[in-house]
Design a protein with these regions (language model features):
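Gram-negative bacterial Sec-dependent N-terminal signal peptides
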Residues: 2-14, 18-39
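C-terminal PAP-associated
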Residues: 41-494
């Protein structure tokens, strides 16, 4: 789920952004890729048949049963062969999904089992909201897994942020705790784009952050003619393993016509400093309206610094280069990481600055002084003359930095029937100064088979985590060729 206030002079409106020939073309692209790319282990399918296939809750809209999008991954530091993946299950065309599902493995990703999470009415024991979105999971040092959701109704404006925990590696999940709820009859508030981060050294402690879009009153007709919306960042934490959570509080306050989105915390395990990264959206509303920004806390979230801007987020958006059809991506969502040994910070995002603003590529900036200064944005992806999108970043204990992303390099000129898409990784061994060792992780697959949510959609983000052994593991979505009853699956790279 992603809600963003979009300004349309002279009024403001709230837009729910959810944004044989085929076989032969994809086969040809795959054959070319096999020649150009070194051999590596095939990705493992993580997802399976939808547990919500019989659920009829949540309309109106087009529901893509068996379509999985937007995965996230966390490795259990107490047992690294145990990992949890979470994703949206049965994506809707106009926002969210039937529910969220957790996949879990106890053999390092060779095999996976699955269970519904209790965040929506389609799930056993779930909250009574019609849909769920924005899956997230994070393991603490004692093996407790924390997961969060945006849960909401399509039939009205009721919505909430909820959290659930697992003490058995993802097999079962606790009844959800509601961190904040803004239910009907109010139409003033919508909570969105949450994430959760477990403290890597303090067992039982985890932090949730999200943005809340706020209109000035509960009259939706009056709100059509106001410019007084805003979207501050909220924060809640648990110190008892998810049994209780602190009252939600604002940690980034913004004036009218400004908002944050994509909040995500990383923790320095040596100093305990918390860093919350986000997109700070400010007028004038043009390609530079978004800014990659962060705040920090040295007292476990009690107080926070003022926002510091790292760089303009100059996204151009993503479309099919040959047809102009929209592809919905995480174009306004920065992704951060921290070196657990040195505390060096990294953040990646989509940006058009490297090609004159014509299409998105992958930018990275890094800080070695706790965010006091940042490097100029560096292009990470291999230039192909085509868009690259949905970056993820992680750092291992030796300081190696992996960035993953999709791109359209496999698309041939004149091909308007398919959109071959590849998933790639690159690594830096010099603190983010250079990136090399490019390798294909997945694809090519046809993006045009993905659910359409105001654009072909496989998620605003994809998963990536690293084992204590410095083994990186991407988690990502691909489409399934020619199977419209099972458009997408989640894959794990061993």
């Amino acid at each position: 789920m992603r809600r963003q206030i979009v300004f349309h002079s002279p009024v403001t409106r709230l837009t729910r952004l959810t944004r044989l020939s085929r076989f032969n073309q994809l086969s040809a692209a795959l054959a070319m890729a096999a020649v150009a790319t070194a051999a590596h282990a095939d990705p493992v399918v993580v997802s399976g048949p939808s547990p919500f296939a019989a659920c009829t809750i949540g309309g109106p809209g087009t529901n893509y049963v068996n379509a999985e999008v937007e995965p996230w991954l966390s490795v259990n530091p107490a047992n690294p062969t145990n990992m949890i993946a979470v994703w949206q299950q049965d994506r809707w065309s106009n926002g969210g999904a039937h529910g969220l599902v957790a996949g879990y493995t106890f053999d390092g990703g060779a095999t996976w089992a699955r269970t519904p999470q209790p965040f929506s009415a389609c799930a056993p024991g779930g909250l009574k909201y019609e849909r769920a979105s924005d899956p997230w999971v994070s393991f603490g040092p004692d093996g407790t897994a924390y997961s969060v959701s945006i849960s909401f109704n399509q039939s009205n404006n009721s919505n909430a942020v909820a959290a659930s925990v697992s003490a058995d590696g993802g097999q079962t999940w606790s009844p959800p705790a509601v961190l904040i709820a803004n239910d009907e009859p109010t139409t003033q508030f919508f909570n969105d784009k949450e994430s959760v981060t477990a403290n890597p050294v303090k067992a039982g402690t985890a932090y949730a952050v999200w943005d809340r879009l706020e209109l000035p009153n509960g009259n939706p007709y009056a709100n059509l003619h106001t410019q007084a919306y805003r979207g501050p960042t909220f924060f809640s934490k648990t110190t008892d393993g998810g049994k209780t959570w602190s009252a939600a509080k604002v940690i980034v306050d913004v004036p009218s016509r400004q908002q944050t989105i994509g909040n995500q915390i990383v923790v320095d395990p040596k100093t305990g400093t918390l860093y919350d990264f986000f997109d700070l959206i400010q007028p004038p509303f043009n390609k530079a309206a978004g800014k990659v920004a962060f705040i920090k806390s040295s007292d476990d979230g009690a107080t926070w610094s003022k926002p510091q801007v790292i760089a303009a987020l100059q996204t151009a958006g993503v479309t099919d280069p040959n047809t102009g059809e929209p592809v919905r991506t995480g174009d306004i969502i920065p992704e951060p990481a921290i070196d657990p040994a040195s505390g060096q910070l990294y953040v990646v995002w989509q940006d058009g600055r490297f090609n004159g603003g014509n299409y998105d590529e992958i930018a990275l900036s890094t800080s070695t002084d706790g965010g006091a200064s940042w490097s100029a944005p560096l292009q990470v992806n291999t230039p192909t003359g085509r868009a690259a999108f949905n970056p993820s970043v992680r750092v291992d204990s030796a300081g190696a930095v992996m960035v993953t992303y999709y791109d359209f390099r496999d698309l041939a000129a004149g091909n308007t029937t398919t959109l071959p898409t590849g998933f790639w990784r690159k690594i830096s061994h010099d603190g983010g100064t250079t990136f090399a060792d490019e390798r294909r992780v997945g694809g090519p697959f046809d993006m045009k088979l993905a659910p359409n949510a105001e654009g072909f959609f496989i998620g605003d983000y994809q998963g990536l985590d690293v084992l204590p052994s410095s083994s990186f593991h991407p988690l990502f979505v691909q489409t399934n060729a020619g199977n419209l009853t099972n458009r997408t699956d989640v894959f794990f790279a061993p």
